[in-house]
Amino acid sequence: MVKAIKVMLIPNNVQKTKMFQYAGASRFAYNWALAREIENYEKGGGFISDAGLRKEFTKPRHSDEYAWLLNISNNVTKQAIKDACTAYKNFFRGLQKFPRFKSKKRSMPKFYQDNVKIRFSNTHVKFEGFSSSRKANKQKMNWVKLAEHGRIPDRKSVV
């Protein structure tokens, strides 16, 4: 069973910048996948699966124009592409309206983090990929401070 706990974070300026970079990459991947699906549909092609789009996304990710994407965790863009495909499928099933492109101004900045790769302490939380090397990722400066202490139960207190 996975339990969700909503917590408030207090990131420093470097961490805040990194979070906005993650959200921007997520928005970029979502918009790219949606544009690719629309383009394919207009040409008379069928639905492209999220696995196919993720394979296609590696080309722009490794190009010089989008080199900034290499600093972002792969899981962030992967989940954004999955979300775009799900929204597109739901439209054709008649469950939702046509998916809109994500705007920097209108959309709420958000990104995906794999729940297995998040680490918690009593006072801090560490996200996946906040630094470029494993050694730097273990340092305390990469841990984001929690606003409420003791809100997340320790492994000892979980039964």
Locate predicted features.
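Nucleic-acid substrate recognition interfaces
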Residues: 1-159
